Curated annotation (Swiss-Prot):
The keyword Transferase applies. This is 6,7-dimethyl-8-ribityllumazine synthase. Keywords: Riboflavin biosynthesis, Transferase. Signal peptide: none annotated. GO terms for biological process: riboflavin biosynthetic process.
Length: 152
């Protein structure tokens, strides 16, 4: 037997958790995600967005939304840009672990769409210029995973 998730969003309820820190970038990611949801048939009123202060706060809110039972999938969006200290490494590792753990614990797909880049230029590229929009990609993954889990 082959299990596959289809890219149709009709009937899905989804949540976006987005970090306000680096909002110049994250607002573009959220826009890309909403565009993907719309293009794949997710109703506009079936998409809720929670803004958190920074990337470190994403896992807690994503887990709470997933546990609510109101959503078929949650996507997480943020931009962590390397600086002169080791803060970047701690934040990236903890956010990634937190999101993965919350998804496993709740059984709800929580998609990691947090950019981890070495420069602001790389982040801008991934938020809708040269390298596409990672928010859009995260939304498409959420649709596919929500549908896949319905078939298993």
């Amino acid at each position: 037997m082959v299990f596959e998730g289809f890219l149709t969003g009709e009937g899905l309820r989804v949540a976006i958790v987005a970090a306000r820190f680096n909002e110049l970038i994250t607002s573009k990611l959220v826009g890309g995600a909403n565009d993907a949801f719309r293009r794949h048939g997710v109703a506009a009123d079936a998409v809720d967005t929670a803004w958190v202060p920074g990337a470190f706060e994403i896992p807690l809110v994503a887990e709470k939304l997933a546990k609510s039972g109101n959503y078929d999938a949650v996507i997480t969006l943020g931009a962590v840009i390397r600086g002169a200290t080791s803060h970047y490494d701690y934040v990236c590792n903890e956010v990634a672990k937190g999101v993965a753990g919350a998804s496993r614990e709740t059984g709800v797909p929580i998609i990691f769409g947090v950019l981890t880049t070495d420069s602001i230029e790389q982040a801008v590229e991934r938020a809708g210029t040269k390298a596409g929009n990672k928010g859009y990609e995260a939304a498409v993954s959420a649709i596919e995973m929500a549908n896949l889990l319905r078939t298993i």
